[in-house]
Every structure is written in structure tokens, then in C-alpha cells.
Amino acid sequence: MQLSKHFSLKEMTKSMTAQRRGIDNTPGAGEIKSLGDLCYEILEPLRAHFDKPVTITSGYRSEALCEAIGSKKTSQHAKGQAVDLEIFGVPNIQTAYWLQNNVDFDQLIMEFFDKDDPAGGWVHISYHESGSNRKQVLTFDGKKYSEGLPEMKWSGGKVVN
């Protein structure tokens, strides 16, 4: 089932943990609608801007899958409202900055950020269509969360070390 031009339900629900443990990771109708909203409002604009495929490293997670991986059952992933992503060839911090400045979102987290490796970690982003997106931006360095994205050096619209 296609959720949008470039994103399918299969890629938004794929989980090696679910496959290995025999966990049903099938979303309900409400979660599928939320995944579609996420695709149209966040992922399609992101793909169009960078003109590269967006890799979903974690999308929808059933409550059973959340429990299996140590995530909260109340996670926005369990509601179909969040994804973790990367774009091959684009530093994750650059992706995070673009998202912060160009789309409506609820929460944006630059996960496992290392200033010496702007391509490291991954980007977590969530969206819900209720109109009450918080626009919360955080950076997680593996130990603690901090508000906002880290300051970076830029040249020609790209992150430089």
C-alpha cells in the first residue's frame, strides 16, 4: 500500500526485531492515516528538497514492538506520528536544520549527535494533524537532551567541519 508517491506502508512498518520475534507490527486505520499525514507533510517535502531517497530507519511501532525494544507504549511511533530517518550523502545535522526551517512538525530530535561527525546519529521527527504541533527541537548526545540544534559551520548551504 502506497502512503504517498515515494513512501509505502511496508517501509514505514518494517522492523527486524518484529520479524525475528514474530511480533505483529500492523497499524490500525488511525495509525495508517497518521503515517500518510507524516509522508505528505514531512517526508515528501524533504525528499523533494534534497532530491534523494529518504531512508526510514524506524517508523510505526506496535505496542508489542515498543515493549520489545524498550520504548514507551505512548511513543509517537506507536501512533504512526513519528519516524527516524537518514538521507544517504546528506549529513544528518543538515537534514535536521532543513526540517526545522521548512516543515510543520511536533518534535524534531537530532539523535546521538557528535560534533566531530555531522553525518552520525539520525533524525527523529514527528507530526500530527491536530494543528497543535509543538515545534520542539532537541539534540541528544547519547547522555543528555539539550534544547535546539547545535551551532555548525556552514559554507554554500552545507555543513563543513
Language model region names:
Residues 73-93:
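Acidic, His- and aromatic-enriched active-site or binding-groove loops in soluble protein domains
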Residues 68-78, 113-116:
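Short, flexible, solvent-exposed loop/turn segments with mixed acidic/basic and small polar residues
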Residues 38-42, 65, 81, 91, ...:
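Amphipathic alpha-helical interface surfaces
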Residues 49, 78, 118-120:
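A generic structural signal for short, non-catalytic loop/turn and secondary-structure boundary residues
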Residues 87-161:
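Catalytic cores and adjacent binding grooves of peptidoglycan-active enzymes
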Residues 1-49, 142-161:
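Extracytoplasmic cell-surface/polysaccharide-interacting catalytic and binding patches
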Residues 44-70:
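Extended, low-complexity, intrinsically disordered C-terminal regulatory tails
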Residues 55-57, 82-86, 124-126:
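Structural recognition of the beta-strand scaffold that forms the well-ordered cores
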